[in-house]
A protein has these predicted regions:
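Polytopic alpha-helical membrane proteins, predominantly small-molecule transporters/carriers
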Residues: 1-131
Length: 131
């Protein structure tokens, strides 16, 4: 579960880094927005990298790399949706809600049977050296 919380926190930082400037005045130079966004995004790596290592089956976690990516994308979508509605105050069209529902359905499909998949098809990245 720590994997999910770390991925969630990393997605909050990344969403803020990518979209906060849309509510900022246009008088600020683009380079300023880029530098501030980079400073917000940098700590995101400090959360995402450990989350992926902790969650990967080859390192004792429960997920394949593909499953981790799909989880990350689903979390990014949820975080973005909240940011869009609360901070940017933009409305979504029904087509966008349907598109998001399809992505979440894909998450369900990808995670179904994950323990069997992870145990059977992913080889450990770290093995003991045989003398």
């Amino acid at each position: 579960m720590n994997t999910i919380w770390l991925l969630l926190a990393s997605n909050v930082l990344m969403t803020v880094a990518w979209y906060w400037h849309l509510k900022s005045p246009a008088s600020v130079p683009l380079l300023g927005f880029i530098l501030i966004s980079w400073l917000i995004a940098l700590p995101e790596y400090g959360l995402a990298v450990p989350a992926n290592r902790m969650g990967h089956v080859s390192l004792g976690g429960s997920f394949s790399a593909a499953q981790l990516k799909i989880i990350q994308e689903a979390l990014a979508l949820v975080v973005f949706l909240i940011f869009l509605l609360v901070v940017l105050k933009e409305a979504l069209r029904w087509q966008e809600y349907v598109g998001m529902a399809l992505i979440m359905t894909g998450l369900g499909v990808a995670l179904s049977g994950r323990t069997r998949y992870a145990a059977a098809s992913v080889k450990p990245a770290i093995t003991e050296v045989q003398p």
